[in-house]
Amino acid sequence: MASSFSTQLVQSQNLLPRFHAVQGKPHVVSSIGCSKLSSTYHYAPRLSVSQQSKAKSITSRRITCASGAQGEVAELQAKVTSKIFFDIEIGGESAGRIVIGLFGDAVPKTVENFKTLSTGAKGYGYQGSFFHRIIPNFMIQGGDFTEGNGTGGVSIYGSKFEDESFDLKHVGPGVLSMANAGPNTNGSQFFICTVPTPWLDNRHVVFGHVIEGLDVVKQLESQETSKLDNSPKKPCKIAKSGELPLDG
């Protein structure tokens, strides 16, 4: 576990057990980072994936991500009920658009939270906020629109809401999931996986998938970051966000 977080994570170590060496197999090291929110920590935990076996995907259909990396395939685990876009700027320059399909039939409350924060229908939300934490070969994390550094954010239901379902899994690049501080502590922070992350299953609520612009996700993933807190050295901004027509 990363020493810089060791003091902060005493209370949450029981949530994600450390992976140890198995006889005859390489050691797999975990290091968990987090961000503080109302005396708790919202995080997407870090774990090397070099020795992880691929998670089995439960899919309803398969699509090739438009504008994604060559040969990249996205597995959609549920019906897309709405589409959200993020127009991304890196270092003040346009980097392109990410389009996310949301699984409203599977996790309606979680999707409604994300969709409302994306459209700004309540007067606050993701537009103008930043991806505050990036870990290569793992995930990019954002959604803190109050502080911009991982210490804030709020849901449309109040500061926190419950884990709706763990039926959907972290099957690969493009999976959208909620960051949390343990059971039933969802707010506004989210992360997008850049690799399969099966150790997050049954701990974080999956509620969508990148269906266009995975190359933009990869641009974000490739940014140089601080060794202290994995924050990108160039600002990675959601310059504009909103909802798209489902058939558009």
From Swiss-Prot:
Tissue expression per record: Highly expressed in leaf.
Regulation: Binds cyclosporin A (CsA). CsA mediates some of its effects via an inhibitory action on PPIase.
E.C. no: 5.2.1.8
Gene Ontology annotations for the cellular component aspect, listed alphabetically: chloroplast stroma
Region named Disordered: 223-248
Reaction(s) catalysed by this chain's protein: [protein]-peptidylproline (omega=180) = [protein]-peptidylproline (omega=0)
Keywords: Chloroplast, Isomerase, Plastid, Rotamase, Transit peptide
InterPro entries the UniProt entry points to: Cyclophilin-like_dom_sf (IPR029000), Cyclophilin-type_PPIase_CS (IPR020892), Cyclophilin-type_PPIase_dom (IPR002130)
Record's function text: PPIases accelerate the folding of proteins. It catalyzes the cis-trans isomerization of proline imidic peptide bonds in oligopeptides.
Protein name: Peptidyl-prolyl cis-trans isomerase, chloroplastic
Organism: Vicia faba (Broad bean)
